[in-house]
Amino acid sequence: MRRCRWPAGIERLTGQYLGREWRRDDGALVRIDRCLIDANWGTSTDVVYQFCRQSAHAGVVMPSHGRFVGASSQPFSEYRRRQGDRIGHNWRMPNVHGKRAVRHVVFDTNFWKSFVHARLAVAMGDRGCLSLFGDQAEQHRLLAEHLTAEYRVKTEGRGRTVDEWKMRPERGENHWLDCL
């Protein structure tokens, strides 16, 4: 059995980014206060949970599970709230017990992909704009390819219309869109 080598990489990465302060445009210093780590990736789920339990940044890192919520699916707003659950706009943090016993976030991937794409469409400088830093397109080419690896399809079901995101057949990878 081959040992998974990325935990050392994720430890270095979280150490570099979560262990420092960042200066905003107005000069104020801020820290990253929440970092979600994809726990839906095959056999690495248990490794992600273990890392989140044992990390020096255990109060900041949290496993996450993206869920496809299509038009015919039950939307997050209709889930029955249980004691200890935390509920947000198209995300929830279920109360946990058992083997993994680590708080984790479950979120509606279709909603959040639409959210990111809507922000990228806002004009530069306007309220709600999401932009890439700098003017050297090559620095952002891979990110742009991942962000455009899927397309939205408006779908109706259960009396509502939602965007459902589908992979473009000619594109191979969408990992960075999934992790935004």
Language model: regions and residue ranges:
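Gly/Thr-rich phosphate-binding beta-strand-loop-beta motif of the actin/hexokinase/Hsp70
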Residues: 1, 179
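Mg2+-dependent endonuclease catalytic cores in nucleic-acid-processing enzymes, primarily RNase H-like
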Residues: 2-158
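Glycine-rich anion-binding loop/nest that anchors nucleotide
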Residues: 32, 161-162, 178
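Short, solvent-exposed helix-loop connector elements
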Residues: 159-171
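C-terminal folded domains that constitute the principal catalytic or ligand-binding module
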Residues: 174-176
